[in-house]
UniProtKB/Swiss-Prot annotation:
Protein name: Sorting nexin MVP1
UniProt remark on domains: The PX domain binds phosphatidylinositol 3-phosphate which is necessary for peripheral membrane localization.
Protein's gene: MVP1
Topology in membrane: Peripheral membrane protein
GO molecular function (one): phosphatidylinositol-3-phosphate binding
Domain of life: Eukaryota
Family listed: Belongs to the sorting nexin family.
Length: 523
């Protein structure tokens, strides 16, 4: 549980034992080396049944699996023995803060009692604060960045793919330019994600698609999936109310030169966003412990929710593949019927007029099947290019929120309790020194400086803890807007089915009407 108000020490839970078993189910398998073999995601385990279906999908599952592996293993976010995991997260409650520790702003300490605050969670001020944040984020907005693969691969020994990245609107804090296109590599996207994680560790930074799965770095289907994943990544970044204002994001989208060369020459800032910031005391007055309880509940359920949505997305992809097969089989059926009609005349030489009439109607059936194949193809393309993308985008959003929770558990610790105890001990020593004439002045001054330094550190850590709390609340609040993505994707799904079901019905009605004149007897 991500209990932001707990005074208990952070123990090493089973999910955080080591980078190897932080995701126990995310292990490389022999299947990783081939796309045609079954690759399992951390949440869609091999041979996991869903009714009569078995989710051993080799596409989306592999993509999510590799994304999780990159996030938790290759990035090495967790180091064994990390002190933060054993430290009190929010420090001691005010009742345990010694009032004699002058200079410490105890108003920033975690509040044990909420009696002085608004008893109800949704107070007017808090509601206004939340609404102002929610208005800054619209996950249903249209994509404003397009990512296209450049067919020619570069490199002498190791070939790499370049992407044409084009923004369709004028970006914040930039001048309108006739050239809104830049060329970027996968490594450039990776650099952007890394610097965003350094600057905004407690923001919803979307994950990148895997650079490769096994040996699939040149497979056309994999490259198409990766391009779509990169497009989802950059559009989620540019939709975020904070990330879209970042100078490095704007640089990524606007600097026309090679980004690798630019990085070597330029001096750019990657310091954490909280540097030199002070928490607004108005926010502290808005805080309510129930907010952290909501986060804990969301954190406890997020894996289960992610698993369910991935299953849904896998089944949508299967539907897309079935549409492709249906389209091909309808065309094949049309050709087979045409062949039958061409040869049927030899079987009925005595009834040439009748058989020719029948064959002309069979030709109508063949054309009808080709028309249905075209309809199935259009439906498949719409599923692939629009509907499936919306399902995957919601996966990216959930994983981004999960990343916030996980990074909090790893990076948000402090040692306020330890420092407080040390200040209390040193204060007692200082008082005993004052009554002891034999103590040297240098020793007294050194101890006093240590106390002052620890007080400053406590104040800084309390300030950072509140800034983190505010940041995560902002992210959780704007995340609430993504619930409408669920509505949107299912509305689009139903709309698409109605559209193509109507086309199919109309086509069958026309062919049925034409077949009414097909001979049933010699008369």
């Amino acid at each position: 549980m991500m209990d932001l108000d707990s005074q208990e020490l952070w123990g090493r839970g089973p999910s955080m034992e080591s980078p190897n078993n932080a995701w126990a189910s995310v292990q490389r398998t022999p299947a990783d080396s081939a796309r045609t073999q079954q690759i399992v995601s951390p949440v869609v385990r091999q041979a996991e049944s869903l009714g009569s279906l078995t989710l051993t999908d080799s596409s989306l599952s592999a993509e999510v699996k590799e994304t999780m592996r990159n996030n938790y293993n290759e990035r090495k976010m967790y180091e064994p023995g990390t002190p933060a995991l054993e430290q009190t997260v929010w420090g001691a409650p005010p009742s345990q803060l010694d009032a004699s520790i002058s200079g410490l702003d105890t108003s920033m300490a975690p509040v044990a009692s909420q009696s002085s605050m608004c008893d109800e969670l949704h107070s007017e001020d808090l509601e206004n604060w939340m609404n102002s944040r929610r208005k800054t984020y619209n996950p249903l907005a249209k994509n404003i960045v397009v990512v296209e693969e450049i067919p020619e691969r570069e490199g002498i020994l190791f070939k790499h793919t370049n992407y044409l990245v084009k923004h369709l609107v004028v970006l914040p804090n930039t001048n309108p330019s006739s050239n809104q296109t830049v060329i970027r590599r996968y490594s450039d996207f990776n650099w952007l994600q890394e610097v965003l994680l350094k600057k905004y560790p407690f923001r919803m930074i979307p994950e990148l698609p895997p650079k490769k799965i096994g040996a699939q770095n040149a497979d056309p289907i994999f490259l198409a999936r990766r391009r779509k994943g990169l497009c989802r990544f950059i559009n989620l970044v540019i939709m975020h109310p904070v990330l879209k204002q970042d100078d490095l994001v704007l640089t990524f989208l606007t600097v026309p030169t090679d980004l690798g060369s630019w990085r070597k020459q330029a001096n750019y800032d990657t310091t954490e966003e909280f540097t030199d910031q002070k928490i607004d005391k108005a926010f502290i007055s808005l805080w309510h412990k129930e907010l952290s309880n909501q986060w804990n509940k969301a954190d406890a359920k997020i894996d289960e929710l992610l698993e369910s949505w991935i299953k849904t997305s896998v089944l949508v992809e299967r539907y897309e593949r079935r549409m492709r097969q249906v389209s091909e089989e309808r065309r094949l059926l049309g050709r087979v019927i045409e062949e039958f009609a061409d040869n049927s005349v030899t079987l009925y030489p005595l009834e040439e007029g009748t058989i020719h009439d029948i064959n002309s109607h069979i030709s109508t059936i063949s054309k009808h099947l080709n028309s249905l194949a075209d309809t199935s193809k259009k439906e498949r393309q719409e599923v692939e290019e629009h509907l499936s993308v919306k399902f995957k985008t919601f996966i990216d959003i959930i994983i981004a929120l999960k990343g916030v929770f996980d990074r909090y558990k790893i990076m948000a610790g402090n040692n306020i309790a330890h420092l407080q105890r040390r200040v209390e001990i040193n204060m007692d020593k200082l008082q005993s020194m004052e009554s002891n004439p034999d103590v040297k002045g240098a020793e007294y001054d050194k101890l006093r400086q240590t106390i002052q330094r620890d007080k400053r550190t406590i104040a800084e850590q309390l300030n950072r803890s509140w800034l983190i709390r505010k940041c995560i609340l902002e992210e959780f609040v704007i995340f609430q807007e993504t619930q409408f993505c669920i509505t949107h994707v299912f509305q689009e799904w139903a709309k698409m089915h109605v559209k193509y079901a109507n086309e199919t019905t109309e086509s069958w009605e026309k062919v049925y009407a034409n077949l009414q004149d097909m001979p049933l007897s010699r008369s």
